[in-house]
């Protein structure tokens, strides 16, 4: 990677998240917008990426071919869909490009492909790039170690009507943080749905509830409930810019790293706390 400005490429440049990633890349010192990508056949191809994002002319035009811009970026930022991200991952691995992956909804094979690629390239892969969410994950680990053995743990998340996966990647990351703190595997203790006659709550499980409505950017709550008291730890996002800023900050953090799989807690040095 270059020692000067880190040049980033943005996938899905015409989407809501893509436009905010462009804004964030143009705003952060030490980062340069090198390329912007959209799918083949998009009406946005050839548009100026900065103008598309409402940030003024940049001279970077929206392209559909990664091969055409492979010399224009060092780190690829991807918040698209799993199938597209895995195609981009293969390209970046072949060409030695770092990646910041905010795509959610991967199956186990997809996650393994990311782990495998990290042997050759540096990747930041996180369910949520918000600073606040990642601080929350650390707090959940602490709370689980103190209260997790005797409380009922529930995770409630809410997002906009257009979100296609559930539970959210962030909700799953919350569950994994709690389960790990309790020396459990989330797949063995998660309860993702309840309906009809469920019987009493099974001790030691982690419940999930999902809301999809309106334009909710993202709300997540973890509840540790006992008889007589409960602790709730909540994060509410009011703008996608918090995710975009964190992702671009992660791209800058990758400077000088040749390989390895990292998450936002590494970027923020939360693992040392």
From Swiss-Prot:
One of its GO terms (molecular function) is NADP binding. The keyword Electron transport does not apply. The active site is at 159 (proton donor/acceptor), 163 (proton donor). It catalyses: (S)-2,3,4,5-tetrahydrodipicolinate + NAD(+) + H2O = (2S,4S)-4-hydroxy-2,3,4,5-tetrahydrodipicolinate + NADH + H(+); (S)-2,3,4,5-tetrahydrodipicolinate + NADP(+) + H2O = (2S,4S)-4-hydroxy-2,3,4,5-tetrahydrodipicolinate + NADPH + H(+). The gene is dapB. GO terms for cellular component: cytosol. Catalyzes the conversion of 4-hydroxy-tetrahydrodipicolinate (HTPA) to tetrahydrodipicolinate. It is found in: Cytoplasm. This is 4-hydroxy-tetrahydrodipicolinate reductase. NAD(+) binds at residues 12-17, 38, 102-104, 126-129. Its EC number is 1.17.1.8.
């Amino acid at each position: 990677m270059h020692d000067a400005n880190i040049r980033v490429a943005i996938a899905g440049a015409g989407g809501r998240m893509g436009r905010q990633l462009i804004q964030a890349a143009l705003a952060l010192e030490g980062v340069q917008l090198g390329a912007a990508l959209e799918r083949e056949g998009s009406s946005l191809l050839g548009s100026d990426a900065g103008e598309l994002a409402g940030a003024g002319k940049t001279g970077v035009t929206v392209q559909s071919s990664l091969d055409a811009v492979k010399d224009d970026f060092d780190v690829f930022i991807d918040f698209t869909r799993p199938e597209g991200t895995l195609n981009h991952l293969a390209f970046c691995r072949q060409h030695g490009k770092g990646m910041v992956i905010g795509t959610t909804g991967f199956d186990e094979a997809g996650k393994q492909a990311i782990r495998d690629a990290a042997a050759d390239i540096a990747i930041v892969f996180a369910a949520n790039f918000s600073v606040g969410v990642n601080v929350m994950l650390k707090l959940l680990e602490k709370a689980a170690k103190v209260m997790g053995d005797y409380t009922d743990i529930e995770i409630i998340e809410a997002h906009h009507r257009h979100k296609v996966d559930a539970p959210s990647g962030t909700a799953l990351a919350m569950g994994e943080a709690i389960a790990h703190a309790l020396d459990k595997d989330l797949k063995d203790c998660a309860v993702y749905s309840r309906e009809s006659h469920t019987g009493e709550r099974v001790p030691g499980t982690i419940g999930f509830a999902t809301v999809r409505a309106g334009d909710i950017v993202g709300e997540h709550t973890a509840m540790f409930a006992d008889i007589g008291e409960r602790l709730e730890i909540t994060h509410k996002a009011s703008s996608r810019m918090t995710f975009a800023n964190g992702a671009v900050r992660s791209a800058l953090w990758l400077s000088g790293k040749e390989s390895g799989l990292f998450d936002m807690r590494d970027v923020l040095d939360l693992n040392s706390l």
